[in-house]
């Protein structure tokens, strides 16, 4: 304790705090001024050091600067990353062995060419995957997150299998590289979407940087464990495969738990369908936490294996349909209906085709119109099984309840600015001032 003489101006106590926000502040010293100056510093140095270390791995203002689901997701994501880099050492060891590292007969140019083909295939695969699926990743981030890690596991499996097929080595490793290229695109894109979701204080860059630190730490720990595991299992194929398969099972389990922790408040096809179905039945809106526990996260091909009597409502709606692809009879009915006064200023049209609802969007439709068209289509799909006059009943329901639905969604914490959907490339334009109807 240190004391210095000061002028007598009453008693004043000043506390010194350290931290970047109120959620991380802690007291480091207490200064008392009366007839003398007294400075008492905090004795808890460990707490100070621990907070400094933590600042390298969690966003500034944590936990108040991120959503509540951040901690659970990052915990399971770190565990899956740890298992990934541990088993990566096993697959890399097998790959290097197949290329010929350590063999006298192996040539530098031969190994270089094989590595070139492997990387070239992966780069080409990444471009093709982005071309075909890049615009779909935002709308189903949970599913694509799982798919990304599944494809990574398949890629590592190909590397581990490569020594067993020396005559088809190039084909096997190229398939593995192709699989991992899908991982790079899907994982990076969904990570960007999730970072925006976690950011409560416009701190996406900080969250991304700290996530990079977490991943680097998991990488270093995983590679260290992987080196030990590779050393202990070297020359024992049974132990290698048992270790790899065990780590793969844990990896997928950790990924599943990670995406299950996510509570997204954006509207996509499935979440909108769940919300609307419940609203029609009860007049109430489910919370993001409730919907999160109800929505599916498995890939589409996995959910299609389940035996169901009827398709979910969101799978019976086709958004942004190309008009010329409709059956001629349905197209004629649609064109005749455009002349009705109710459609003159409409921003979308609905067509009922073989139990499904097709949505034709106007070329001037806005994000709010896209959301309304999809909600209207879900209402129509729900009414088709209950009434023969579903078109008129659907119109009446939208006119009466749509604004109420939006208000309750906003009050419940949902984002209603837009519908997260795959890219809509087909739109239409209709003119009904005479008997003419024009479509672009």
UniProtKB/Swiss-Prot annotation:
Protein name as catalogued: Protein root UVB sensitive 3
Pfam family, one: UVB_sens_prot
Annotated localization: Membrane
GO cellular component: membrane
Family per record: Belongs to the RUS1 family.
Keywords: Membrane, Transmembrane, Transmembrane helix
PANTHER family (UniProt xref): RUS FAMILY MEMBER 1, RUS1 FAMILY PROTEIN C16ORF58
Protein topology in the membrane: Multi-pass membrane protein
Bilayer-spanning residue ranges: 109-129, 154-174, 232-252
Database matches in InterPro entries: RUS_fam (IPR006968), UVB_sens_C (IPR055412), UVB_sens_RUS_dom (IPR054549)
Record lineage: Eukaryota, Viridiplantae, Streptophyta, Embryophyta, Tracheophyta
